[in-house]
Curated annotation (Swiss-Prot):
Cell location: Mitochondrion membrane
Gene name for this UniProt entry: MT-ND6
Main localization (coarse): mitochondrion
Keywords: Electron transport, Membrane, Mitochondrion, NAD, Respiratory chain, Translocase, Transmembrane, Transmembrane helix, Transport, Ubiquinone
Identification of the protein by name: NADH-ubiquinone oxidoreductase chain 6
Protein family (similarity comment): Belongs to the complex I subunit 6 family.
Species assigned in the record: Pseudosoriculus fumidus
Enzyme Commission identifier(s): 7.1.1.2
Topology of this chain in the membrane: Multi-pass membrane protein
Keyword Translocase belongs to the record: yes
GO cellular component: mitochondrial membrane
GO molecular function: NADH dehydrogenase (ubiquinone) activity
Functional summary from the UniProt entry: Core subunit of the mitochondrial membrane respiratory chain NADH dehydrogenase (Complex I) that is believed to belong to the minimal assembly required for catalysis. Complex I functions in the transfer of electrons from NADH to the respiratory chain. The immediate electron acceptor for the enzyme is believed to be ubiquinone.
Reaction(s) catalysed by this chain's protein: a ubiquinone + NADH + 5 H(+)(in) = a ubiquinol + NAD(+) + 4 H(+)(out)
Length: 178
């Protein structure tokens, strides 16, 4: 069941990035980034990194959404161009979407000799997503996530905070007209 969930979330992740890259207006690009950020956090949550998924969700979608709101308000068009207005972009997007759906249906519900297999070996994913506590199972994953964020991931907190402050200062200078 988890393989199906990760496959569906990965498909939505790819489709949202295709929608972001084929944006005709800044508003639709931001929507694609919001969807891809939320789905990416869902993938991390599915692998057991609940605190990491929550932190990325709060930092990315909370902080950068403010910057996105200011910048789209400054670049707002009265009648924004939509994906339908450019037939080539729309047909390319739809063709990629249909192709990916057909491929996923073929791989997941295919014949007996064609089975969907995960090629990568995920034996050491504990080092990637969650802070591995070893044999001491008495600690909560949430508390270990906080400890890992502020001990091993202090650079992430510093870089995230600094980049958010820089973005807000730049947006404030742009909106004031300087």
């Amino acid at each position: 069941m988890m393989t199906y969930i990760v496959t569906i979330l990965s498909t939505i992740f790819v489709v949202s990035f295709v929608g972001f890259s084929s944006k005709p207006s800044p508003i639709y690009g931001g929507v694609g980034l919001i969807v891809s950020g939320g789905v990416g956090c869902g993938i991390v949550l599915n692998y057991g990194g609940s605190f990491l998924g929550l932190m990325v969700f709060l930092i990315y979608l909370g902080g950068m959404l403010v910057v996105f709101g200011y910048t789209t308000a400054m670049a707002m068009e009265e009648y924004p161009e939509v994906w339908v207005s450019n037939n080539t972009v729309l047909l390319t997007f739809l063709l990629g979407l249909v192709g990916e759906v057909v491929l996923m249906i073929y791989l997941l519900l295919g014949e007996e000799e064609v089975k969907f297999e995960v090629v990568l070996n995920f034996n050491s994913e504990g080092d990637w997503v969650i802070y591995d506590t070893g044999d001491s199972g008495m600690f909560s994953e949430e508390a270990m996530g906080v400890a890992a964020l502020y001990s091993y991931g202090y650079w992430l907190v510093i870089v995230s905070g600094w980049s958010l402050v820089t973005c807000i200062i730049v947006v404030m200078e742009i909106t004031r007209g300087n």
